Amino acid sequence: RVEDIQETVLSHLEETTPGIVIERRRYKTSELAEAVRKGEVEFFLGSSGFFVEMRPYGVRDIGTIVSRSFPDPNQCVAGVIFVRRDRADLKSISDLAGQTAISTDPRNFMTFQIGMGEIKKEGFNPDKFFRRIDFTNSVPTEVVRSVADGRADVGLLRACMLEAIEARNPHWQNLFRVIGEKKGPRADRLGCRYSTDMYPGWTFAVMPHTPPILTRHVAISLLSMRPEDTPSGFAVSFATNYASVN
């Protein structure tokens, strides 16, 4: 879960940098983008897509979150595209053309943009592919609810979100089918259904106005985080293939 990653990283920083006061702030994607533009933060933890989008403002990555299951920082996250299982007419990406879709936020790389990128890879214009796209103001459960209730034909989320929401809402289990579901060792390790290529994971970045000495201490702290020391087995590495995000 995103909350597990955030809590693990921040708690580790607080424990290993006692001389640094860390003020936690939680933002939605659009709010964080505004905070970066205004220089209101020194560091941020965001998706690799968000990091790439913020590069023009001088941000630099100082670590990518990895786990025991996904030690390669270039291949950590994926998207899931899903429909109701009883929609026999929707079995492939091409079948989704002209349908209504729903996701969390148009600027969210993991929940929305990865899925739209997969549609482009299939040869379609993502800007004209769906008849309508609705958004839930960053509430993933409402994406699932809308597809379950038939208010939207297609849902787009980050991989593993669907399973997590189903676990909290058992009446939705076995109600959905994943479009273009990937199979193989990566899928087995992830333990979740997904529809897209994999991309770099959560990225810890520093702003250009942050003092270098402070950045050094934070970077050293991040790199000292070991899977065996964290509840969810997270560590920090460095992604090298942000070209896939573009």
Q: Could you describe each region identified by the protein language model?
A:
Residues 45-58, 117-121, 148-149, 153-187:
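A ligand-binding cleft/hinge motif common to bilobed small-molecule-binding domains
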Residues 7-14, 84-87, 172-245:
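Extended ligand-binding regions for polar small-molecule ligands
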Residues 31-35, 140-146, 152, 161-162:
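Short, hydrophobic alpha-helical packing/hinge segments within bilobed ligand-binding/sensory domains
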Residues 34-95, 106, 116:
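Acidic, polar ligand-binding/catalytic clefts
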Residues 1-53, 57:
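Extracytoplasmic small-molecule ligand-binding "clamshell" domains
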Residues 2, 100-108, 133-134, 149-152, ...:
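Second-shell loop/turn segments in exported
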Residues 1-16, 74-145, 160:
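Bilobed "Venus flytrap"/periplasmic-binding protein-like clamshell domains
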Residues 59-74, 129-132, 166-198:
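Short beta-strand->loop
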